[in-house]
Amino acid sequence: MLILQAFIQSPGETFLNLGYITIRWYGLLISVSVLIGLFVSKKLAKARNINPEYISEILPSLIISSIIGARAYYVIFEWRLYSGENFFTSFELFNNIIQIPSFLAVWEGGIAIHGGLIGGLISIIYFCKSKKINLKTFIDILIPSIILGQSIGRWGNFFNNEAFGVPTNLPWKLFIPIQNRPLEFINYEFFHPTFLYESLWNLLIFIVLIITFNKQNKKDFFRPGFISCLYLISYSFGRFWIEGLRTDPLCIGGLPPFCDGGIRMAQFISIFLFSSGLIGIFFLRLRTYIGKNRKNG
């Protein structure tokens, strides 16, 4: 019963307070994701005869570019939350309170995975060109770690009491404190745990990608780039439907919680990425077909 209670109600965003420094769950989960991702990607790189140390080399720039991209994407579409009187926020450093621009306070939440993917992709392209590595193969190596990191990172939303869905009375409903509820749902206590839905969906994708990766050498169907396309299709499919439940969408031409008169940005991007994945697989299969005909001819 205690486990169930802890599951449906966040214990708070703070993992440990050491006085001079506060360790938050969000930061801890990101750190764990990076370490696990480093281990997984090195294993996959070795399986593709690519120097595993390349993973360690790209890691710093990949983290920085992904965080910058994820934060910038979110701030651009939610600038109203960081402008005017909200431009500065308080930050405690060695028992001293200082004022910093609120858009720099990443630890308070407010990042978007699609922006992180854009930032990370820029870093990967530059790295592959400088090292003369096959881009599609290298991305295929990194993708399973990325989706696993997304699965783990979603629990940061749980501890921050954010990114939840519309009200519900389902047995797995999530309690949200009144100060974290949208004004439209201020009188509701329980909401869809959309963080959990996406975390489990992403974990399932990770398993499928690893199975596919291990079969890539055995079947000609799975050419370099197939893992990346499969990720785009599967993640975008799940994100599209889960996004429809959320009360904090980034909107184009509308305002949360329903983007009335506009469109949810994440759903728009999901449609684009889903289509890109399908087109990518089509061209991969086309290249395989043409290659076989040339050999037979």
Curated annotation (Swiss-Prot):
A 1,2-diacyl-sn-glycero-3-phospho-(1'-sn-glycerol) binds at residue 154. InterPro entries: Lgt. Pathway: Protein modification; lipoprotein biosynthesis (diacylglyceryl transfer). GO terms for molecular function: phosphatidylglycerol-prolipoprotein diacylglyceryl transferase activity. The chain crosses the membrane at residues 20-40, 57-77, 105-125, 133-153, 193-213, 225-245, 266-286. GO terms for biological process: lipoprotein biosynthetic process. Its EC number is 2.5.1.145. It is a multi-pass membrane protein. GO terms for cellular component: plasma membrane. It is found in: Cell inner membrane. It is an enzyme of class 2 (transferase). Its main location: membrane. It holds the Pfam family LGT. Keywords: Cell inner membrane, Cell membrane, Membrane, Transferase, Transmembrane, Transmembrane helix. Belongs to the Lgt family. Catalyzes the transfer of the diacylglyceryl group from phosphatidylglycerol to the sulfhydryl group of the N-terminal cysteine of a prolipoprotein, the first step in the formation of mature lipoproteins. PANTHER family: PHOSPHATIDYLGLYCEROL--PROLIPOPROTEIN DIACYLGLYCERYL TRANSFERASE, PROLIPOPROTEIN DIACYLGLYCERYL TRANSFERASE. This is Phosphatidylglycerol--prolipoprotein diacylglyceryl transferase. It comes from Prochlorococcus marinus (strain AS9601).
